[in-house]
Amino acid sequence: MKIVLQHLTKKFPARGSVRGRKNREDVIAVNDFDFEIPDGKLIGLLGPSGCGKSTALNLICGLLKPTEGKIFFGEDDVTGLPPENRGVGMVFQNYALYPHLTVEKNIQFPLENLKGADKLSKEEMSKRVLEAAKLVQIDHLLERKPNELSGGQQQRVAIARALVCEPRVLLLDEPLGALDLKLRKDMQIELKRIQQRTGITFIYVTHDQEEALTMSDRVVVMNHGVIQQVGSPTDIYNEPVNAFVADFIGESNIIDGVMLEDCKVEFCGRTFECVDKGFGRNTPVNVVIRPEDLKIVYAGDGLLQGVVESIVFKGVHYEMMVRTQYFTFMVHSTMAESVGKTVGLSVIPFDIHIMHKSAEAQA
């Protein structure tokens, strides 16, 4: 189901006073959200803690009322509808399973609260529960209690419970945060499989950049309640629109530079070829280079020369800090250099990304 957010804003009254003032401006948790969520896709809401992503999720499900704007599910305006009438399922980091009920009864619980024309017979409920349990691969655990399950199994129960009512959209608020790294990665793959098999629109809140890039069809990057960029994981990583996105998504070297003309930029006292155009002449810009795009070469062969200040083994690569005259670069390489060694740095034009200074993250 397609979801459309039209100029969605949520303000909260400020509490207390500051330096003797009795009144403070309202806190804007979500500011002018205006974008469309395609039908049957997994959308990641990504941003640091306190950026408004959970507030946005609560607006979509109806737990909060927007201060301004509208929410459409398909062609239906659901802005004023309560959560139970929106056809949404929710999964939280806290699984909230009933400890005294079996897995089967936990999954069945929301079906027992259906009323009127939606009420199901016992046979229909049992069928729905079994289908949901099979989908998340826990149909062999239906007679167990939550305390007899692992963390990953408990998470699957919570997902099955959210899916058993056949929601139009599933909202997930950092559901894997309590799991260890290996299990979290396994569940990322599992959630993507479930989404693709059901065709339900998933909206997934996370502050984990790798998680968002791994799972999402499209990523919405947020900061201070404002959408910074919407795009595919590849676009978000390779073509960040501002310094905040570049710095928040993965690691970045962000250097002050001057765009001399199309495809030519100056930074760190040297002139480099790049592929960007349309910035005008002699325009101050931010230059973004990913650590993995910098290559360490012999000192005399690099456009930049520097000294290796530190080296850390990260498992798949070494992370080195190379101090040049103008900037200390982070470099990722599969080959380690010794601390104190003078090296050269090279980068190809395609890996030099240019952005306007005025396009930095809004605060």
Q: What would you call each of these model-derived segments?
A:
Residues 46-48:
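The feature captures the beta-strand-to-loop junction immediately N-terminal to the Walker
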Residues 67-70, 224, 256:
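Conserved coupling/switch loops of ABC nucleotide-binding domains, chiefly the family-specific signature
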